[in-house]
């Protein structure tokens, strides 16, 4: 049980949490993405490791189709305290959701057949093949060996490990409620159980947006260049994402990619089909945003049925059909289903809010009143 003084701020609390983890676990691994939250968490953990003369792992799953600035940021974190860092930079083959192509539902990262088109080079200093000795576990054969499968197998290969993740409650309340339903370690509610006796901890769970940037500024830490670009463009903080360029929550970044990193955009054009179309329509309300019905369609339900009928990846189609069977049949839900389909969101990273149509509810309310 960790107790805090009433005047303890979030930074002091996070340091106490990380110290507690160091006291109770021999092996600690921090997941990093190049984003601001994992940058702060990695720095806090590395400072504690340096103070104790211990080593911790930094885990980065390289999705290949990423900003060059992301690679630079990850290299920066890996080199901050080299004497205290174990490098778990994975550059292995796996499947990734592809929301920018209407024909290819997945990107096969580090595909040997596409080596001349790889977005950036692999390094001998990184992990280039699956390091685990157990039989590889794949959650869904239809999806193949995917992003989360890599993480699961890595955690299975690291029994009894403390995995630190930069999840913040204010950024993803629904996800945080899901992971904090039951304590993963003793009575620590900001933790969840991981495979093989491991535990995932979220030491920054109560930090807000300004806490993150204050820590970065106070400690003069380098951060991803994309944040400055977005700030100058007036992008809302919630839309500043540095994940893969084909992710269903980051596809709009492609609209500005030619301006931010023109060389990366040129490589992406050659690597993935449909990028040019996605770049032109990323902010189109009729396409990826699914905010307006395209011409020729009279309702969202009719448009959804059309998309299901013409969905190009027949292996992934049953995933959507099974999921949609559990949804209500109204226009509000159907519009969200259309968005999942046009973004190839078979992973359900943009879950449908399965409720009654609020417009119909409002109409019925006023009918009763009047």
Predicted segments with their positions:
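Nucleotide-activated chemistry modules centered on ATP-dependent adenylation/adenylyltransferase
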Residues: 1-31, 36-370
């Amino acid at each position: 049980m960790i107790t805090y003084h009433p005047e303890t701020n979030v930074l002091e609390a996070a340091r106490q949490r990380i110290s507690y983890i160091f006291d109770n676990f021999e092996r600690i691994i921090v997941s990093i993405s190049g984003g601001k939250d994992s940058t702060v968490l990695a720095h806090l953990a590395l400072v504690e490791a340096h103070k104790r003369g211990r080593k911790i792992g930094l885990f980065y799953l390289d999705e290949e189709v990423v900003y060059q600035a992301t690679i630079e940021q990850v290299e920066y974190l890996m080199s901050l305290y080299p004497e205290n860092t174990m490098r778990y930079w994975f550059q292995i083959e796996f499947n990734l959701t592809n929301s920018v192509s209407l024909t290819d539902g997945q990107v096969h990262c580090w595909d040997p057949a596409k080596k001349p088109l790889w977005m950036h080079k692999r390094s001998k200093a990184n992990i280039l093949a699956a390091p685990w000795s157990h039989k590889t576990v794949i959650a869904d054969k239809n999806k193949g060996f995917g992003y989360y499968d890599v993480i699961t197998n890595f955690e299975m290969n690291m029994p009894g490990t403390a995995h630190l993740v930069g999840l913040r409650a204010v950024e993803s309340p629904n996800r945080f409620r899901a992971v904090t339903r039951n304590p993963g370690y003793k009575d620590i509610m900001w933790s969840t159980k991981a495979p093989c006796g491991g535990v995932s901890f979220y030491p920054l769970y109560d930090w807000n947006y300004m806490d993150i940037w204050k820590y970065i500024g106070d400690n003069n830490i380098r951060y991803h260049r994309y944040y400055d670009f977005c700030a100058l463009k007036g992008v809302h903080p919630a839309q500043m994402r540095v994940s893969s360029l084909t992710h269903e929550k980051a596809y709009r970044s492609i609209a500005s990619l030619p301006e931010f990193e023109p060389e990366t955009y040129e490589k992406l054009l050659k690597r993935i089909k449909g990028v040019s179309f996605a770049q032109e329509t990323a902010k189109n309300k009729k396409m990826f945003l699914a905010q307006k019905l395209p011409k020729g369609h009279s309702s969202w339900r009719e448009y959804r049925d059309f998309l299901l009928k013409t969905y190009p990846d027949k292996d992934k189609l049953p995933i959507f059909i099974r999921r949609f069977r559990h949804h209500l049949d109204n226009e509000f839900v159907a519009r969200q289903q259309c968005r999942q389909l046009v973004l190839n969101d078979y992973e359900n990273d943009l879950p449908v809010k399965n409720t009654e149509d609020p417009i119909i509810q409002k109409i019925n309310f006023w009918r009763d009143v009047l």
